[in-house]
From Swiss-Prot:
Compartment(s) where it occurs, according to its Swiss-Prot or TrEMBL record: Cytoplasm
GO terms for cellular component: cytosol
Assembly and oligomerization: Homodimer.
Protein name: Diaminopimelate epimerase
Native species: Hydrogenobaculum sp. (strain Y04AAS1)
UniProt: substrate binding residues: N11, N72, G82, N83, N189, E207, R208, G218, T219
Entry similarity comment: Belongs to the diaminopimelate epimerase family.
Record pathway: Amino-acid biosynthesis; L-lysine biosynthesis via DAP pathway; DL-2,6-diaminopimelate from LL-2,6-diaminopimelate: step 1/1
Encoding gene, per UniProt annotation: dapF
The keyword Amino-acid biosynthesis is annotated on this UniProt entry: yes
Marked site positions, Could be important to modulate the pK values of the two catalytic cysteine residues: H155, E207
Gene Ontology BP annotations: lysine biosynthetic process via diaminopimelate
Amino acid sequence: MLITKYQGSGNDFIIIDNRDNFVYKEIEKLGLSINEFVRKLCEQHTSVGADGVILIEKARNTKNHFSWAFFNADGSAAEMCGNGSRCAARFAYEKDIAPKDIVFETIAGEIEAHIMDSKRVKVQLTPYHSHQKNIEIKTEYGTFKGHFVNTGVPHFVIFVDEDELDNLDVEKVGRAIRYHEYFAPKGTNVNFVAKTKNGSFRIRTYERGVEGETLACGTGSAACGINAYLLGLSASNIVDIITKSGELLKITIENDKVFLEGPTTKVFEGMLSYEIF
């Protein structure tokens, strides 16, 4: 099985061309479910390791270039992934599946993507919705006031100062908020954000499905940009987000339209050994 690994701002993904349904046939031979296959594939140290797996599949609507099936590292399916969508678009372009201007299908809806140059990809996310301001969540680690928005997947955004951001235990606090009854039953992603002196925003994210802090989160960065703009913390509708990996993501808000732009990297491509299963 040919696999390709890309990373976008520190989020890494295993991408497989499954337009002929080959993957499901292979994992059936292995006696695995798709969820078990993904979990094993994403394991660090003993396997390939990744934040998620993307299967490129045939589009249901013939006017679109492809559809995807996105899986978190824990094997669960996800509606959307911002950095994953940028990596998937570059993969599709480099494999001649799609041109530079791409439309593809996700559970959250259609995503438009544009190949800006050899590495940079810009995507228009699905319209954001369900924005709620000033929600107080009480946890064993304290009470946290934040703002909820769905950018294809649910996100809770908490603004803090830079010192607090640096010293925060994102794993513990993020997990407590992610599983809080307020967000039941599906839970939420949790973002801690600090404005810098130059007007950009630093972000740390606890990702649902990965169940831990990640080096970046595209939809989380979008949620941060949306809230920063709507709450008046950013004077511009173009918001610079600095991820934990140190890379810059550019978020542009135009009414209910949100654009995510940043770099991607092709890490490797090769044949998967079934010995890991």
